């Protein structure tokens, strides 16, 4: 599997395998994912995976995962009454400082400022409902 086309992009035969790894990152974004796990899902070495993923998606796997986590955090901050600290943990960050820094870098405002923008909108989903009904996407059987 593999090789590259003349334009430097990964061979078309590799695309479904990269998609499989990206789907894994999408499903398990809140879990600590390692590069070798994602590369194994694609069936290539981690070094080849890193280059191919970045060439196809325009982001490294780590940057893609961070972006996915922040997108999910935005959803939770907009639509639920879960605290910023709870959102931080739900989307896979173990440090509120790291989460807030990455959120501000990608969104342009702090998580608290972002959440405050939506405070007067439609009624928000209670945090207890988010946790009870698995809306946080976290696996319970882990």
Regions of interest found by a model, annotated:
Residues 1-48, 55, 60, 72-101, ...:
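Alpha-helical bundle regulatory/interaction domains
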């Amino acid at each position: 599997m593999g090789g590259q086309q003349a334009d430097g992009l990964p061979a078309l035969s590799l695309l479904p395998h990269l998609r499989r790894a990206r789907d894994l990152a999408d499903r398990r974004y809140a879990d600590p994912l390692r590069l070798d796990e994602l590369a194994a899902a694609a069936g290539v070495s981690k070094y080849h995976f890193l280059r191919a993923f970045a060439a196809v998606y325009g982001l490294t796997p780590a940057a893609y995962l961070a972006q996915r986590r922040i997108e999910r955090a935005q959803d939770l901050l907009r639509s639920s009454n879960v605290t910023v600290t709870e959102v931080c943990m739900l989307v896979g960050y173990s440090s509120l400082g790291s989460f807030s820094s990455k959120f501000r870098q990608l969104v342009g405002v702090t998580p608290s400022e972002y959440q405050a923008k939506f405070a007067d909108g439609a009624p928000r989903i209670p945090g207890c409902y988010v946790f009870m009904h698995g809306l946080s996407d976290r696996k319970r059987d882990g």
